[in-house]
Amino acid sequence: MNPKLVIFALATCVAGLSQALANPQVQMGIYSPASGGNYRANPNAELEWVLSNYVTGKSTDGTYFGTFCIEKNEYFSNGGTYDVVLNNKAISGGVSSPTAGYDVISKGTAFLYTQFATGMLSASYYGSAANAAKLQDLIWWLEGEQTSWGAGTYNSLLLAEFGANWQVDARADYTGSAVKVMNLTSNQGRTQNQDQLVYVGVPDGGTTAMMLGLGLLGIALANRKSRRG
């Protein structure tokens, strides 16, 4: 294998990744049974790769994906389009935002959203506005946005996952990479809007292509050394 061709292919993958993440945006909407979440997000071309991580008919309708907000004191307009930065934390806003200016999402939030996105919640959940509201309440509690959660059964999922001490352990900082926060802004970044959750899977968008390119480069260099030997 020609090393120059491999390096060119790798550079193309990296350039493609940079272009894909150049200007991601979402159009936000209110709850829709077709999308499954408390809110819905329609990604533009630069972010639509996330749709493949959701389950059609449950957490996505193929165009929108269901999402939940993690800040109670910031907002979005129904039908509004917002710039997106993928992060692991809410920025600035939020009732519980610390003096550092950001708030890392909790393990419990990441767990519940993963269950939602991958279609693992009970069949009765999907398409129910009432159940979506209950799950949103629990996520707000996990994120310190309110002091209690509404009536529902989703806290039983946290008990099963985190054990008897779930009310403490589920609120610990999430250190994984499958669930991200969409930091939403408008007015060219001057206005901070309500941050939302997104499931990017593991590895997240573009990483697979980069890993493949690096793997091919490694094979090419190894072959070159063996020929010299």
Which residues are covered by each model-predicted region?
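Sec-dependent, cleavable N-terminal signal peptides
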Residues: 1-22
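A detector of low-complexity, intrinsically disordered, Ser/Thr/Gly/Pro/Ala-rich segments
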Residues: 5, 10, 61, 79, ...
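N-terminal hydrophobic alpha-helix used for membrane targeting or insertion
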Residues: 8, 125, 202, 212-213
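Helix-centric, low-specificity signal for extended rod-like, repetitive segments
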Residues: 12, 127-129, 217-218
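Short, surface-exposed polybasic-aromatic patches that bind anionic ligands, especially phosphate groups
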Residues: 23-200
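A short, hydrophobic C-terminal helix/tail in secreted or cell-surface proteins
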Residues: 203-223
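Short, charged juxtamembrane terminal tails flanking transmembrane helices
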Residues: 226-229
